[in-house]
């Protein structure tokens, strides 16, 4: 005979199963929006690569019969005189003549393969735009503008969602590191806590006092307690009118609690998974705003992140050293994209697409913390100046 399970195990199994069923919708609700955004971005990049490869990759039959190109080549032959001896004057004329070279004359169909077009699409919706690859046809230019019009907001949506994940990871990692080393909370001076989180008790005095008086009852307003400085009659009339207007507004408006309950908990109709997805969509971008990490820590993360890519990139881009690779990665992640460094093998760099997205978000977090710190410094300076002006005798 088989051994029967103890009653405690029977009771624990349904409880554990219930907890697992409850956690699965929440986990899916957190991961599903980000995965959907990322899948949409990948699909958008693939569709754009196919379109640009078809539009810009077509051979131009009129390129060989272009009169401007023929005249350019004839003048070039006249300058060179079809020999290898070039005098100083002819060299100067040659440099001036080459400045009239148009990029569409050098266009080749193999330059717009599917992978090259995919690399171009990544530079468009990421707003990097290196500059060495761009459309030259009229249809390609209009298609590029339309593609960027929808691709850039989609890219920012993906960055915002990934930013919440990175903010959560960085915040928890720093908290555990701080607890492991038993560090005090104010060990770093450059923290962004006063600006990232608004204190609930930081309301102005002129807003807090009328709110307290209005919340009082009518009897308390009509029969106030005796005090040393009795309020003026005009102040009492104004406060009484505010109280009456507020009571009328509360009577005219229907109770909103049932409506808020039905709107905030659509799981009664849509299910727990749908409710979790909707609630997570409403909270997109909130984790970055609540992030509280010292600036030296995030600066160290940025330096380590760029250094890793700068050490790996020269393995296939042999012409780049560590310094040039570090400069290229920084220009890419900050979306500056000068275009002064051109990758010989951009197809391999496509594997760094996730690296670029994550790196752009890390730099955005660093810039956000720096912005908060500068704003805090500016506010402190303004408060100091205002206090000096108040203390000065007039």
UniProtKB/Swiss-Prot annotation:
Q: What is this protein called?
A: Potassium channel subfamily K member 18
Write out the similarity annotation. Belongs to the two pore domain potassium channel (TC 1.A.1.8) family.
The record gives the effect of mutating residue 132 to N as: Insensitive to extracellular protons
The residues that hold K(+) 4 are: 127
What outcome is recorded for mutants in which this gene has been deleted?
Answer: Splenomegaly due to increased lymphocyte proliferation.
Q: Note the Pfam families from the entry.
A: Ion_trans_2
Q: What is the activity-regulation note?
A: Activated upon cell stimulation via Ca(2+)-mobilizing receptors, such as CHRM1/M1 muscarinic receptor and AGTR1/AT1a angiotensin receptor. Activated by volatile anesthetics, such as isoflurane and inhibited by local anesthetics such as bupivacaine and lidocaine. Inhibited by extracellular acidic pH. Inhibited by Zn(2+) ions. Inhibited by hydroxy-alpha-sanshool, an ingredient of Schezuan pepper. Inhibited by Ba(2+) ions.
Annotated residues for binding of K(+) 1: 127-128
Question: Beyond the main fields, what else does the record say?
Answer: Regulated by extracellular protons whereas human ortholog is not. His-132 is responsible for proton-dependent specific activity.
> What are the start and end residues of every segment in region (Selectivity filter 1)?
127-132
Q: Which GO terms describe its cellular component?
A: plasma membrane
| Gene Ontology BP terms | cellular response to pH; potassium ion export across plasma membrane; potassium ion transport; regulation of CD4-positive, CD25-positive, alpha-beta regulatory T cell differentiation
Could you say what the effect of mutating residue 131 to E is?
Acts as a dominant negative on wild-type KCNK18 or KCNK10 subunits
User: What's its job?
Assistant: K(+) channel that conducts outward and inward rectifying currents at depolarized and hyperpolarized membrane potentials, respectively. The outward rectifying currents are voltage-dependent, coupled to K(+) electrochemical gradient across the membrane, whereas the inward currents can be induced in response to activation of Ca(2+)-mobilizing receptors. Homo- and heterodimerizes to form functional channels with distinct regulatory and gating properties.
Q: Where is this region: Interaction with calcineurin?
A: 210-215
Disease field reads: Frameshift variants combined with alternative initiation of translation result in the production of aberrant truncated KCNK18/TRESK proteins with dominant negative effects on KCNK2/TREK-1 and KCNK10/TREK-2 channel subunits, causing trigeminal neuron hyperexcitability and migraine-like phenotype, similarly to TREK-1 and TREK-2 double knockout mice.
Q: Note the coiled coil stretches, chain numbering.
A: none
Instruction: Enumerate the glycosylated residues.
Output: 83
Task: List residues binding K(+) 2.
Answer: 128-129
Could you tell me the keywords of this UniProt record?
Answer: Cell membrane, Disulfide bond, Glycoprotein, Ion channel, Ion transport, Membrane, Metal-binding, Phosphoprotein, Potassium, Potassium channel, Potassium transport, Transmembrane, Transmembrane helix, Transport
């Amino acid at each position: 005979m088989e051994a029967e399970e103890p009653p405690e195990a029977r009771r624990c199994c349904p409880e554990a199963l219930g907890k697992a069923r409850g956690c699965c919708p929440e986990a899916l609700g957190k991961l599903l929006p980000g995965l959907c955004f990322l899948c949409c971005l990948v699909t958008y990049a693939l569709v754009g690569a196919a379109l640009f490869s078809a539009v810009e990759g077509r051979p131009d039959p009129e390129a060989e019969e272009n009169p401007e190109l023929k005249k350019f080549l004839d003048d070039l032959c006249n300058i060179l005189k079809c020999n290898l001896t070039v005098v100083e004057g002819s060299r100067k004329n040659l440099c001036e003549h080459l400045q009239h070279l148009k990029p569409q004359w050098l266009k080749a169909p193999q330059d717009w393969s599917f992978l090259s077009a995919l690399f171009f699409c990544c530079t468009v919706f990421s707003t990097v735009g290196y500059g060495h690859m761009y459309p030259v046809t009229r249809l390609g230019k209009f298609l590029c503008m339309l593609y960027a019009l929808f691709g850039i907001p989609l890219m920012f949506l993906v960055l915002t969602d990934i930013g919440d994940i990175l903010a959560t990871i960085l915040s928890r990692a720093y908290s555990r590191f701080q607890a492991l080393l038993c560090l005090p909370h104010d060990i770093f001076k450059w923290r962004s806590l006063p600006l990232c989180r608004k204190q609930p008790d930081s309301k102005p005095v002129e807003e807090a006092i009328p709110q307290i008086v209005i919340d009082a009852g009518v009897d308390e307003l009509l029969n106030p307690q005796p005090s040393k400085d009795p309020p003026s009659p005009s102040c009492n009339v104004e406060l009484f009118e505010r109280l009456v207007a507020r009571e009328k507004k509360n009577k005219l408006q229907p109770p909103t609690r049932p409506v808020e309950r039905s709107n905030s908990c659509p799981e009664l109709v849509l299910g727990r998974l749908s409710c979790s997805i909707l609630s997570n969509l409403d909270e997109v971008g909130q984790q970055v705003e609540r992030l509280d990490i010292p600036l030296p820590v995030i600066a160290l993360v940025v330096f380590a992140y760029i250094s890793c890519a700068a050490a790996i990139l020269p393995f296939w881009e042999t012409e780049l050293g560590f310094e040039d690779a570090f400069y290229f990665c920084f220009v890419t992640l900050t979306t500056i994209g000068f275009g002064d460094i051109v990758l010989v093998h951009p197809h391999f760099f496509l594997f760094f697409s996730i690296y670029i997205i994550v790196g752009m978000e890390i730099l955005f977090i660093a810039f956000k913390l720096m912005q908060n710190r500068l704003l805090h410094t500016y506010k402190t300076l303004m408060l100091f100046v205002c206090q000096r002006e108040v203390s000065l005798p007039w």
